[in-house]
Amino acid sequence: MDLERGSKTPPSSAPAAAAATTTTSTCCSNKRPQLRDRLVALQPVVLRAAATLATAVAAAVMALNAQSYTAVVAIVGTRPLTQTFTTKFRDTPAFVYFVIANAIAAVYNLVMLLFRCLILRRRMAGLVVHMLDMVIMALLATGAATAAAMAELGKNGNVHARWNPICDRFGSFCSRGGVALASSFTGVALMLALNLLSAASNAQCSPGQYE
């Protein structure tokens, strides 16, 4: 009888074990939504940080883009006369606009990252930021498209207008300009993704929630 009594499990141990198992499973299930919510919240931050880097690189590379080219223009006797030609981004208004647009976008995104905590405290601020993001994306797109058109003209020229290409003489200038254009178009794509994400987030909120 004593052995039988000792082998029996106390009645209170089974409910306690079940409660511990339930608590453990509940904690694990609660951690998963929290992790997912954190990853979703980090998406705009990552996109904006990448857009800041891309536009800053585009503005810096184009702003520092310059090259000199020396050519023989005449020969007097046996002495060649040379002339040095220099090209800079300031010589083309489209490239100047490109630098300004990318610089504005980089500064804007940096400010949004620094003051993100203050912006998230107000409900209406999300809609305002979304509208500003659309303006910056349009500014970036027009700047990149304008600079790309001028870059294509510099690379291939225009036979009908008798404009000769210059990239055969200013190869480094054109190469650095291509890097700046690629970085700027990357910034446009990132801003587009940021706008789509912001639009989806704002669509989940009803109009009555905005103050």
Swiss-Prot record:
- Which of the residues are on side Cytoplasmic? 1-55, 116-123, 198-211
* Chief subcellular location: membrane
| An example Gene Ontology CC term for this record | plasma membrane
Query: What name is this protein filed under?
Result: CASP-like protein 1B1
- Write out the biased-composition intervals (Low complexity): 9-26
Q: In which compartments does the protein localize?
A: Cell membrane
Q: Where is this region: Disordered?
A: 1-29
UniProtKB keywords: Cell membrane, Membrane, Transmembrane, Transmembrane helix
Q: Which InterPro entries match?
A: CASP/CASPL, CASP_dom, CASPL
Q: How does it sit in the membrane?
A: Multi-pass membrane protein
Q: What is the lineage of its organism?
A: Eukaryota, Viridiplantae, Streptophyta, Embryophyta, Tracheophyta
Read off the Pfam families from this record: CASP_dom
Q: How does it assemble?
A: Homodimer and heterodimers.
Kindly report every residue range on the membrane side named Extracellular. Answer: 77-94, 145-176
As for family, the record states: Belongs to the Casparian strip membrane proteins (CASP) family.
> Which residues span the membrane?
56-76, 95-115, 124-144, 177-197
